[in-house]
Amino acid sequence: MKKIFSLLVLSLAAALHLGAQEIDHLNCFAVLAGKNATKDGSVMLAHNEDDSGEQMINIYNVPRNPAKGTGKYLWIEFPGMEVADAFLNEHGVAVASDGCNSKEDREDYTDGGVLYEVRTLIGQKARSARHAVKIAGELVEQKGYRGSGRTYVIADCNEGWVFAVVRGRHWVAQRIPDDCVMTIPNYYCIGEIDLSDTANFQGTPDIIDYAIERGWYNPEKDGKFLFKKVYSRHDMYNYDRNYIRHMSALNHLTGETYNTNPDTYPFAVKPNRLLEVKDMMQILRSHGENVEQKINHKKKPLHPACICTDVTINASVFQLRNWLPVEIGAMVWTTGASPCAEAFIPWYSGMTKSPEGFARFADPQEAIAKHMSDSKEKRKNYPDAAAWKFVDRWHSICEDWEGKIGKVQQSNSSFQQKLFNGQEKFEKSLRKYYNHKTMQITDTAKLQEALNNYTAEIYKEYFKMF
């Protein structure tokens, strides 16, 4: 009997450990700002991608493929990962995601369901953020979603949407008001829904009825329906790492102090200032310095309040502007590691060639074909990749955090400001390549060359700082 009891204890401990690991790795974070909430009038999507293990960043410029009906897109890729990649396509549609565990335990799939396919199809075919929601919704309803749950943050040069999907075939999406900004840790953030308001909501018609059927929601006892509370897995919805990061970001954006109850957090808020790219970067770099609930962690810079963590493998700020040709107006500022120790480098959607070291395959189609199959021993097989420069720099900083991080951040700050100052001048130099009235490109080859060279030269200068 004693032996059986011991085995039960060990089994329970193992289960709790695995559960903690699963929660521990859910660290992604996103911020989405409408065009009237930003200083320059752009829609902005900021995102931290957090994953453990050996990760290798690649950034491809994938050309159109008429045979497959796919458009041109910029692809931030992590080989072997189904939930890490981000996309920015030729229509200025950007997508990234955060894991959001749901209560759903029923598996309802056709042909194995979908997961990675949601983001790839958006990147390849979406003509707008609203169209992306339609594509994703139809795919989920047809095939079934095989992850526990996830929120896809989608934006174009005019608007932003949040697409929340649950295991199986249920989903709901909400448009962010143009004058607002919203943040997403690793739980659902959509609250009240109104599917009759098709300008601002989309979703499966039975999203409320299904919750009633499962016993998750009782209208008489529970009051108003809050999707985030009803469909979120309880431990994730009330997990301190989630609500503390949420509080921290909301404070950055509004200057107000929030409590620890996620029920009270609005879907979106009006910022206390018009936001700039640098504001989004500041949030992605945050270690929770602005919240009292910051909890000590085994490593000094890392704790449950961190938005930027030791496993942040990429941070991106998509700056999407509708008054420029999309090749120039849609761009992403991105890093190769934790943003607290990196500068964000600009990539334009009109680029056609990645700087040296950012594509492990010369042909993007080979990268697509081998995304899952060729994902082992990446450093051994691709030792010259630029990815390892970022990885090695991060490890070096962590070996002497107190001694190095201050100097690194100071030099990064100066370099970042130099890039901000140079952006306007560079984009003015591109005016000769398009018609100012129609916004049509008049010299595609020279524009592409200028965009390719611009980012490549920045990296050459940046890597000298490593």
Residue map of PLM features:
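Second-shell loop/turn segments in exported
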Residues: 107-108, 117-126
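Sec/Tat signal peptide C-region and signal peptidase I cleavage site
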Residues: 16-21
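A contiguous strand-loop segment
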Residues: 22-115, 135-268, 272
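Substrate-recognition/cap regions that form aromatic- and gly/pro-loop-enriched pockets
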Residues: 293-421
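Bacterial N-terminal signal peptides
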Residues: 6-15
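Positively charged n-region of N-terminal signal peptides that target proteins for export
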Residues: 1-4
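Histidine-centered catalytic/metal-binding microenvironments
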Residues: 398-466
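Short, well-structured alpha-helical segments that form the helix of a local strand-helix-strand
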Residues: 132-141, 280-287
